[in-house]
């Protein structure tokens, strides 16, 4: 890592992004204002059944990353603690309520056990996005309902194009 990269304030915003929602987008937007570099990273979790392929999730992440000069879309197949440490970055997680908070707090402790340098910043979701989740969006998509209110515009266009191809 060069000296410039070491001085930058960097953050990793990890997820499966199946799909990326307006809530994720808001966290990215807010993180991009705070950090010099944000890694919007699709983490591969082989135990998780996804609606969208890794390629599709990566494409959606890149559409959002392209909107911000300091956000980079990425894919990782490793431990989050190792990924963050390699980039000298903090982990940012959005939390919608106490259930998310408790879950993410426990994960932050586990990440610290893996790598003591791993810090996690929990960012509260804005009230208007508290009920939005990828699970909810997937359910709407299964029934061919409009999801444009729940995903960023670029992701909405992507999903519409994908639906037209099917």
Where are the regions that the model predicts?
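Nucleotidyltransferase catalytic core that binds NTPs
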Residues: 1-166
